[in-house]
Amino acid sequence: MIKQYFKQALAQLRQQPLLTTISVLGTALTICLIMVVVMQQQIKTTPFAPESNRNRLLHVKQMSTSNKNWSDDGSSNGPMGLQTAKGCFEGLTTAEEVSIYTIPETMQVALPRGVRTGIDALETDGAFWRIFDFSFIDGKPYSDAEVKSGLPVAVITESVARLLFGTSHQVSGKEILVNDAVYRISGVVKDVSSMASTAYAQIWVPYSSTHITGGDNTWCDGIMGVMRVVILARSSSDFEAIRAECERRRLAYNSGLGDYFVFYRGQPDDQLTMSQHKWANVQPDMAAYFRQQVIIFLILLLVPAINLSSMTHSRLRQRVAEIGVRRSFGATRGGVMGQIVAENLVLTLMAGVVGLLFCLIISYCWGGTLFADSRLMYLNTAPVIEWKMLFKFSTFIYALLFCLALNLLSSGWPAWRASRMSIINALSGKLN
């Protein structure tokens, strides 16, 4: 039966090449557009190295503090200070790992007596390397002991290593200048795409090796600063337990702050919520976000479905007599309707394959523009999109589901009308 549907679909392609080609290309462009929208969100949430554990990550990228002497709506918002990060999150018993790291910054690197170059930097602790799966091609990450001691060690990417030394191998142990201070290279990792929103940098150093945790980088008595926290859960089912422990830690921390107190604004966030958490003082409305996504997909599906439905209706006009003959020889209305929908599904799936290929090519070639957001404007490198970030099994599932939905929307009504017409009208070539 399925083989027969394929034959019938190919026969239509030969008999009505222009109409069928327009229909297939229209469907392909629709699927392409929908999949680009899906990938724009997917690339923010789907795991890929070095953020392969995204489905187990919780984030606290900013928070708020207020004071009993301030007005009711008065608050200071932004990243936290180191004392807050340690007081509220370090050593969580319900989590597998907790890492404290800084907001992205630019550091100047150079060889002694060399030309300085600005690159993207993160300052982290040792747990950072156990949460994210970087690919080391030389050396190793710096350890907890090195962070505790404040040693000037660094991990750099292979492109930075080639820029400085002309090679990315046998670089560990050598010295470079980082903001005019001498650092020893601990390891070299493969380049990281800037789409890895938490792990991305070109150089990583211990936050204890600089002065970033104090001085002008903190305010509100050290409560606020430039630190962030990422939490690795043993399982996503532990998220609520982790949030509950974070809340207990917050209350205990507040008890020692005097007139100050901190609050999380709904955090820790999972990966999806974090991607929508744009402002430090506003908790994202995820219900509104999901409604917006549903409306977008309905528009993207319904508008082309109406056009494709009229094309399906035009193709059926040329098959009215055939439908009448089938009905006169005992074919049921359900059988006629099912065959029309199935034949149209074959064409829709063909178009879906073409549309998915279009989408992958467009995303790979122009992904830096399609998937860029305001965060990337402040980085020193352009966004890099890799096949492994786009080529996911879930991508095929989404494409298949949209093909099925588009097929039902575009062929359901014409098929129903064709199955309901009288045998006499069908044999006389009338499609009312």
Features from the language model and the residues they span:
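Membrane-helix entry/capping segments
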Residues: 3-4, 11, 252-296, 318, ...
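Hydrophobic alpha-helical transmembrane segments of multi-pass inner-membrane transport and secretion
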Residues: 15-44, 284-321, 349-354, 405-406
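Intracellular coupling helices
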Residues: 6-18, 306-347, 417-431
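Short acidic/polar micro-motifs at solvent-exposed secondary-structure junctions
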Residues: 62-78, 96-127, 140-154, 192-193, ...
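Transmembrane alpha-helical interface segments in multi-pass membrane proteins
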Residues: 18-29, 321-367, 398, 402-406, ...
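C-terminal membrane-exit region of the final transmembrane helix in multipass inner-membrane proteins
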Residues: 5, 25, 392-432
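Membrane-proximal extracellular/periplasmic loop immediately following the first transmembrane helix
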Residues: 37-108, 115, 223-226, 373-384
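Mid-to-C-terminal secondary-structure elements
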Residues: 127-141, 152-282
